[in-house]
Amino acid sequence: MSTDHMQQLVARYLAHRRQLGYELVSSGILLRSFAHFADLFAPGLPLTTELGYRWALAPARLSPRYRIARLGVLRGLARYEVLFDPRTEVMPKGQFASGARHRPTPHIYTIAQVRWLMRDAKLLEPSWSPLRALTMRTVIGLLWCTGLRIGEAVRILDRDFDVRAATLRIVPRKFSPERIIPIHPTVVRALQHYQRERLKLYPRSQHLFVSHSGQGGLSLRTTIEFYFRWLASPLRPKGSLASVRLHDFRHTFATNWVARWSRQSAPLPHHLVLLTRYLGHHKFGDTFWYVQPDRRALRHAATTFQNYRDNSQL
């Protein structure tokens, strides 16, 4: 039996899931960690409940929520592998559960923080990767202005960027439909500037954004997330997580718009439907979680949001 039996299994599973449209960035990291653990302490053996628990519970300092996440990724792997190896055991649900589903409170960025992040991105300008700082600045600005998922931003192709119409085409992915989103003229100019600089270095790339190797997609996302953690490390998160995230730009975008509509006494139900469509959500309830009612301007909006979500058939 190969000494990297579990690593091969995980690689096959991740390739299968990614062909279906799932990115599995954080899940992939966890699964590869488990594979190394299994090949070291149980070489050649199948995925069992006991082995899964040994890995999930190994670091004593882990929170129950993180242990649930570790077991969750193993459960998906086990459901796949049991089709090929009947010795595989699927871990039962409900372990370490603490009642209602918990969603972490995101960080809501201020304008000053976004400006600081974009300004300090120039520190990421090594001589062998002249585009890195500009990539980070432009992507951060785009997420702030549009509320896109980072996975959507790194998959944008040149042909998806319509300068005349001032729009971006977001390709369908997973449970999110294809959509065309309008962008501000300042965003158009920033993207045009980035595109010109990128074409000088990587004229054959079809991706709007690229890494130092000229690649977009998952490779670029991994690079951006790595350097963003370093860049944003001085920021103190206001939410329940240990650090700020790229995904918090999406929460910030939704929260700021709902707050603005509330202050303007705009017809919230109508605008909330538009926000749901804009963010690429199929269900109105999915958008509800993006709005954080932690500001005075949001109290009325949050109540309206809650009532509309509970009574809407969207």
Locations of the language-model features?
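Conserved catalytic core of the tyrosine transesterase superfamily
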Residues: M1-L314
